[in-house]
């Protein structure tokens, strides 16, 4: 917990220094981003139980873009009243699988063979 508090204090101090020496418009943008992040976190805290939040935060470390998509999906469902109660870890896993299927990327491998002036006749074994 102390590490998180230190990080929060560092961010706050950095924001104060930037506001003091930077553009006032820049500080307003940062404040808006900060408010939006707090709003997102409060909504997610209301719709996810503790184990699901832990899984989502672990996923955020590895795949932030997928986490953002899942968070947006959960927030949208909460705003339209499609969630009944808190989402459990198993429910979050199902949502993650749905998002993975929708955003599945197909990997193609293309071999580029170069023609080299090499003959096998000169090989000495």
Curated annotation (Swiss-Prot):
GO terms for biological process: apoptotic process; cellular response to transforming growth factor beta stimulus; negative regulation of chaperone-mediated protein folding; positive regulation of apoptotic process; positive regulation of gene expression. It holds the Pfam family dsDNA_bind. GO terms for molecular function: acetyltransferase activator activity; beta-tubulin binding; DNA binding; heparin binding. Keywords: Acetylation, Apoptosis, Phosphoprotein. It comes from the Eukaryota. Residues 17-36 are annotated as: Disordered. InterPro entries: PDCD5-like (IPR002836), PDCD5-like_sf (IPR036883). The modification N6-acetyllysine is found at residue 63. The modification Phosphoserine is found at residues 51, 119. SUPFAM superfamilies: Double-stranded DNA-binding domain. GO terms for cellular component: cytosol; nucleus. The modification N-acetylalanine is found at residue 2. May function in the process of apoptosis. Belongs to the PDCD5 family. This is Programmed cell death protein 5. It comes from Bos taurus.
